[in-house]
Design a protein with these regions (language model features):
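The conserved beta1-alpha1 loop
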Residues: 2-4, 190
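Serine-hydrolase catalytic-loop signature spanning alpha/beta hydrolases and amidase-signature enzymes
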Residues: 4-14, 25
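Active-site loop/oxyanion-hole signature of alpha/beta-hydrolase fold enzymes
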Residues: 14-17, 26-72, 233
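Gly/Ala-rich beta-loop-alpha elbow adjacent to hydrolase catalytic centers
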Residues: 73-77, 81
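Flexible "cap/lid" loop of the alpha/beta hydrolase fold
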Residues: 86-87, 92-122
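Conserved alpha/beta-hydrolase catalytic His-Asp/Glu region
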Residues: 106-108, 125-180
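Conserved loop-alpha-helix segment in the C-terminal half of the alpha/beta-hydrolase fold
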Residues: 185-219, 225
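Post-His helix in hydrolase/transferase enzymes
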Residues: 225-237
Length: 243
């Protein structure tokens, strides 16, 4: 399980029990997040980019002697597992992409420009809460907003700036991912109210032969939190069918 920016492995708390009944489960805290925060300065001095952070994940698999995995990601975590497909496709059995970020629309591009212009001057929690509200504006998205805000509070401003800097590197990478199918079984699980990212995923799935899409009713961006039963059943059935 690969979480998004500002989160931690704890965002999968509604998945762990269900998935452990079927699979061996590995939860990873990305550099600077969760329990990886304490060792950050000692081990993660290389540049922040999607390739290096994805290599962190592969290093964990190597350490645990895991040759192949089914990967489940949420939000920015989906970009990382898609990057792993490029770096080490033989390590990937299938992908479950929740709240996937596959292309930026005009609104999200404006947010990226605004955030990068102000990230060193405005307290990062102001920015984080603003972005969370824009991406997840509805009342039923409140649990997701609160969960991510509580996790983001554990980051320091310096760490937030490093991660936000990744947004500048997203466009060419996402363009490449859109133009190149992985040829691996890929399931996208998207909330029907994920207005910033769902249209782009719908277009991508039409062009990628091995991709499929499940749209979760009454649900926003963080579908594993807002509709966990739907997410769990759909993902488990998909992974089982490709095991």
């Amino acid at each position: 399980f690969i979480h998004g920016a500002g989160g931690s492995s704890s965002i999968w708390y509604k998945q762990v029990k269900e998935f452990k009944a079927h699979f061996n489960v590995l939860l990873i805290d990305l550099r600077g997040h969760g329990k990886s925060q304490e060792i950050f300065e000692r081990y993660f001095s290389n540049e922040y980019n999607f390739e290096n952070i994805s290599l962190d994940v592969i290093e964990v698999l190597d350490h645990l002697k895991i040759k192949q995995s089914h990967f489940v990601g949420i939000s920015l975590g989906t970009i990382l597992i898609r990057t792993i497909c490029e770096l080490a496709p033989d390590r990937v059995k299938s992908l479950v992409m929740g709240g996937a970020v596959t292309r930026l629309n005009i609104r999200s591009k404006m947010l990226v420009v605004l955030g990068n212009a102000t990230k060193k001057f405005i307290p990062y929690m102001w920015l984080y809460k603003l972005f969370a509200w824009i991406i997840m504006p509805r009342k039923r998205n409140q649990e997701s907003r609160i969960l991510f805000a509580n996790q983001a509070k554990k980051l320091c401003q310096k760490e937030f700036v490093r991660w936000f800097g990744l947004t500048y590197k997203m466009n060419p990478l996402l363009r490449y991912f859109n133009e190149n199918d992985t040829q691996l079984p890929t399931l996208y699980i998207m909330g029907d109210e994920d207005y910033m990212f769902l249209p782009q995923v719908m277009q991508l799935v039409r062009n990628h032969a091995n991709s499929s899409l499940q749209i979760v009713p009454d649900c926003g961006h963080v579908c594993n939190v807002e509709q966990p039963d739907y997410f769990n059943n759909t993902a488990i059935n998909f992974i089982t069918s490709h095991s």
